[in-house]
From Swiss-Prot:
Keyword vocabulary terms for this entry: Cytoplasm, Magnesium, Metal-binding, Pantothenate biosynthesis, Transferase
InterPro entries: Pantoate_hydroxy_MeTrfase, Pyrv/PenolPyrv_kinase-like_dom, Pyrv_kinase-like_dom_sf
Primary role: Catalyzes the reversible reaction in which hydroxymethyl group from 5,10-methylenetetrahydrofolate is transferred onto alpha-ketoisovalerate to form ketopantoate.
A single cellular component GO annotation: cytoplasm
GO molecular function, one term: 3-methyl-2-oxobutanoate hydroxymethyltransferase activity
Cofactor: how bound: Binds 1 Mg(2+) ion per subunit.
UniProt keyword annotation of Oxidoreductase present: no
Recorded superkingdom: Bacteria
Protein name, UniProt field: 3-methyl-2-oxobutanoate hydroxymethyltransferase
Sequence positions that bind 3-methyl-2-oxobutanoate: D45, S46, D84, K112
Gene: panB
Single GO BP term: pantothenate biosynthetic process
Family under the similarity heading: Belongs to the PanB family.
Catalytic residue positions: E181 (proton acceptor)
Length: 265
């Protein structure tokens, strides 16, 4: 099957067609997701919580991201794979270049990093060296120790202005994609319309170009059985894994998910 590339997502944006993405951390699930129609997989540092059992993503190391990226690439050779640069692995340009190289050589097509205006120079340097970058603004889990808790973003005017400025700066720096996390849907819609690059939302309403969810949330296998309010357990009606993934893709492509119940205003 033809490999998915970044510009396939650009075509979908131009055609106003939504696409579903999901996290994966091993070859078996990556292969299953690919066979069911997922074309974009995120090897997320969320593995710190979902796989390793930590309370945040902060403890995750670059070697662990490399290991899981290799596993996912073996299971889904034709998927577009985005891999997270973990906490403090891109604190300066040299670290960002070295660690991005490691992820690309491990099988990633794109590296993802969290942050606003301060990451623009890093994105520019990576882009000029042919390393595709996905930005990530709004709720940034690596900043949990600064934020104190996982809060909805963009509810006041100053925050909304800041997030729009960050999105524009990240695009101008050369990022190819942008994740919008837990941003009120009116603002995420405005950002999506403003940018030429595709946006991928999580907890940011249905008008982003794509959606991303953590696989454990989709399959209802989270620790203590709790999932975020913006997510959905697609096995709730006693569907098996394959049917749940098919339903997730179908609801995203038809703009049935996320519903108002999974969005913030």
């Amino acid at each position: 099957m033809k490999k998915t590339n970044i510009y396939d997502l650009y075509k979908l944006k131009e055609q106003n067609k939504k696409f579903a993405s999901i996290t994966a951390y091993d070859a078996t699930f990556a292969n299953l997701f690919f066979k069911k129609g997922i074309r974009t997989i995120l090897v997320g540092d969320s593995l710190g919580m979902t796989i390793q059992g930590h309370s945040s993503t902060v403890p995750v190391k670059i070697d662990e991201m490399m290991y899981h990226t290799k596993c996912v690439r073996r299971g889904a050779p034709s998927c577009l794979i985005i891999s997270d640069l973990p906490f403090m692995s891109y604190n300066n340009i040299n670290d960002a270049l070295n660690n991005s190289k490691k992820l690309i050589q491990s099988g990633a097509n794109i590296v993802k990093l969290e942050g606003g205006l301060w990451v623009s120079d890093i994105i520019h340097e990576l882009n000029t060296r042919s390393i595709p970058v996905c930005g990530h603004i709004g709720l940034t889990p690596q900043s949990i120790n600064m934020q104190g808790s996982y809060k909805i973003q963009g509810r006041n005017n100053n925050d909304a202005i800041r997030l729009m400025e960050e999105a524009i700066s990240i695009e101008e720096s050369g990022a190819k994609l942008l994740v919008l996390e837990c941003i009120i849907q009116k603002l995420s819609n405005n950002i999506t319309k403003k940018l030429n690059i595709p946006t991928i939302g999580i907890g940011s309403g249905k008008k982003t170009d794509g959606q991303i969810l953590v696989m454990q949330d989709v399959l209802g296998i989270t620790i203590e059985g709790k999932i975020p309010s913006f997510s959905k357990n697609f096995t709730k009606n006693k569907f098996g894994i394959e049917k749940a993934i098919e339903l997730y893709i179908e609801e995203v492509e038809n703009e049935l998910f996320p519903s108002e119940n999974h969005s913030f205003n």
